[in-house]
Amino acid sequence: MDWFVERREVSDVLHLRSGTRILPATFERGACVRKGPPSHGEYTWTELSRGTPAPGLLPSEVLERARAPLAESSRLSEGAALREDVVRRLVDVARSAGALHLEVTLREVDRWTLHAQPERMVEDRTRHALLEVKAFHGEAGGPRFDAWRCVTHPDATRLHAALPSLEAWVDTLVRELRETTPAVPCPDEALPVLFPPGAASACFFHEVCGHPLEGDVVARGGSFLARRLGQRVAEPFVHVSDDPTDAQGALGFTWDDEGHAARAVPLLRGGIVTSPMLDARSARALGLEPNGHGRRVDFRHPPLPRMAHTRVEPHEGDLASLLADVGHGLLVQHLTPRHMNLLSGDFSFHIVEARLVRDGRAGPRVGPGVLSGNGLTALAHIDAVGADARNLFATRGCRKLDHGPLPVSFGQPSVRFRELRVRPGT
């Protein structure tokens, strides 16, 4: 038997075409009780709107530890003015740089959990401030183009302290958008593809390496990588891991939602499929120990083996050096998932933002496209990994079954593939 108590507070500031909106803060508290073993236990959850559990829901010693996370007071109210100032100043910068419009989402989240078993109790507290911007450019009556970026900081105070660099970041985004549009058609061919540090690389490795090595998938032999544990699938310099403790202080956690210590799990080590991410249930099924990846969307959901901070380990060089050897290729800056077959490894992604590469230099943007292939072939085609890693947050979270969205993050350097298939999309 165990008990899980959660407190979550969320505050949002948006800037849309209609103006700036400050959304009412959300504040949730609840508890979940598991009776029976993790492999087939019964979970019962209760929302605690008033912060005080009904008599008998929690043992007295658990209730005493839960008083702090269940307290009524807001933990985000002191950052309200800072969040509004960040949004206002970035909108002003985008306007000065010539953007048609800048959409901004600034969300700060504070989460406090307590996991208790008869033999021990552990607490974990996380906070992050997520900034997402989308710049628009185009002439009146003509086509419009956009570019999206995001960044995460541990809280609104440190986000606000980084305003000078954030203003430069938005200014660069808008100017690059203006200089690289209008777009040319996406190629229809197999060609070298590069991912700069950021969204495209994060999306690719999350789908192609992460989900196939979640413990429940591995336990049922349900993925192309699960069937290849211990086998080489990429070059020796390709290392991919998932480490909940490493997220630049923004999204990391010390204990998972089952009370197990979070730790780094090597998914690919030296190009070899190495380890799955495990919760208690999948670990038991595989005859292994949990490794700190049992995560809940919230107190209403039981834990599942999930990714946290998926990273490609840095190797050597940077984007410029990886580009230098490419005569004709595609620099893909932003992907979104389209299709992923865990059994076969076949995948396809929407190309949201990309630029043609000619003679080692990034050129004009291309129109919408589709990147497709097979996971084993794509991993084998990685011929360079840079040392220029950057952290990124999945702004829409990660969904699995009916459990989502769950906050996840990434650490990604530049990555080059000898060849991937691309074609125009819609």
Where are these regions (language model features)?
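N-terminal small-residue-enriched
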Residues: 1-426
